[in-house]
Amino acid sequence: MNAIVCVKQVPDTSGKVAVKADGTLDRASMATITNPDDLNALEAALKLKDETGCEVVVVTMGPPPAEGMLRELLARGADKAVLVSGREFGGSDTFATSQILAAAVNKIGVGPEDVVFCGRQAIDGDTAQVGPQIAEKLHLPQVTYVADIQKDGNSLTVKRMLEDGYMMVKVQTPCLLTCIKELNQPRYMSVNGIFTCYDKPMEVFDYNALKDDPLIEVDTIGLKGSPTNVFKSFTPPQKGAGTMLTGDDTAAQLAGILAKKHLI
C-alpha cells in the first residue's frame, strides 16, 4: 500500500501580494509556502504510514525552486518526492494541471490498495477543482471534504463534511481523497527529518518523461491547453473598522447611531 500526496507551492498571502502591471501575480517576488490544505493531506498520508507502514510519495508541479518545498515535506516524514517541471507545463489552469498531475501519478503507479491525497483547494485559486479532476482522469472513486479517515481492510470509512452536517462514506481503494483542515493537525519537521531529507530520493518528471502518457498532448497542457483565462489579480481594499455595541441598551445605542447618520 502506498500513499501519493499532491501538493502545491502557493504565494504567502499573509504578506504583501505583488501584482504585475498586466494584472497577474508576480510570484517571483513573493514569499511562498506549502498550500495549507495540502499539509492536512500529507498528515493524513503520514498517519496511514504510521498505521500500515506504507510509503508516502509527495508530488508537485512547479518551477525548479519548488524542490525546496518538497525537501521540507520529506523532512516532515514523506519517503519520496517528485517534481513535475518543464516549460511546456507553464501557464496551466486547473484543467491542464490535472492532466499533467494525473499523468505523473500514472507514472508513479497506483496499486489496488493505494490512496491519492489532495488538499481541498489552493489558497491562490480557491477552485477546489484539481483533486476531483485528477480522480476523473484516473478513473478513481473520490471523496471530497474529508474530515476523518478510518482504514477497514481494502476500503476506507470516510467522514465527509457537508454544509449542514456530515456524511459517512465507505470507499474502496484505490481512491482519491481531498482533505480539509478539520481532518488533523499537521506535524512539524523533526530534527532527524531535517538532517535526512536530502538523503531521500527526489525525481524530476519533465515533458519528455510524461509525453507518452495519453493525457499529455500539446493541446491539453500549458497555456495553450488551458480554457481558463485570468485577466486580473488584485488585493481587495481593506474594510473600515466596525463598531461593537455592548450592554443591555444596544438597541438604544444603535438607534442613536442611525439617527446621527439621518438613517432613521
Per-range role (PLM):
Residues 1-264:
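N-terminal glycine-rich FAD/FM-binding segment characteristic of electron-transfer flavoproteins
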